[in-house]
């Protein structure tokens, strides 16, 4: 079950309040200390996980197959992919700022906690990053349209990951 906008804002307010509060005292003997308050990075990770979970069910295989590039017109299919993710964010009642045309980070400051999401669509096993190098501050929803040929068939699906997944093993970045 998704949290309401009010519940989400309350969670953020409580987390920020905890970050600014006095240090937590040690637990009495025999009791475990309380867990530390969630960091902003952890809040982003948890919110992205919630978005990704809904995206995997809302963006069906039929919707993904419909995104397949036709006649080399990649921009047409990308224009269709952004509204799919927008619907997911709206269903969760999240606030965000949409990027303008040809700008990086399609959805900025999602949930008011600085979560930036880039939507990528691919018909194969390559994701093109154009002008923006992936990094730890950008989260990616990758819409894979599936691949069928005589040797291998890979079904369509939604992938979700942090930008570090793309650059950790790169000797170029």
Positions of predicted regions on the chain:
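Nucleic-acid endonuclease domains
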Residues: 2-111, 121-173
């Amino acid at each position: 079950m998704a949290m309401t906008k009010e519940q989400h804002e309350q969670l953020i307010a409580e987390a920020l309040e905890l970050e600014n509060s006095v240090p937590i005292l040690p637990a009495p003997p025999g009791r475990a200390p309380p867990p530390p308050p969630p960091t902003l990075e952890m809040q982003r990770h948890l919110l992205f996980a919630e978005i990704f979970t809904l995206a995997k069910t809302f963006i069906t295989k039929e919707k993904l197959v419909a995104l397949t590039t036709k006649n080399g017109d990649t921009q047409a299919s990308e224009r269709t992919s952004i509204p799919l993710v927008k619907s997911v964010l709206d269903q969760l009642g999240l606030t965000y700022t949409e990027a303008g045309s040809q700008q990086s980070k399609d959805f900025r400051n999602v949930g008011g906690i600085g979560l930036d999401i880039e939507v990528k669509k691919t018909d194969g096993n390559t994701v093109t990053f154009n002008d923006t190098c992936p990094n730890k501050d950008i989260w990616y929803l990758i819409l894979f349209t599936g691949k069928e040929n005589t040797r291998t068939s890979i079904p369509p699906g939604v992938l979700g990951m942090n930008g570090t997944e793309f650059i950790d093993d790169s000797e170029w970045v």
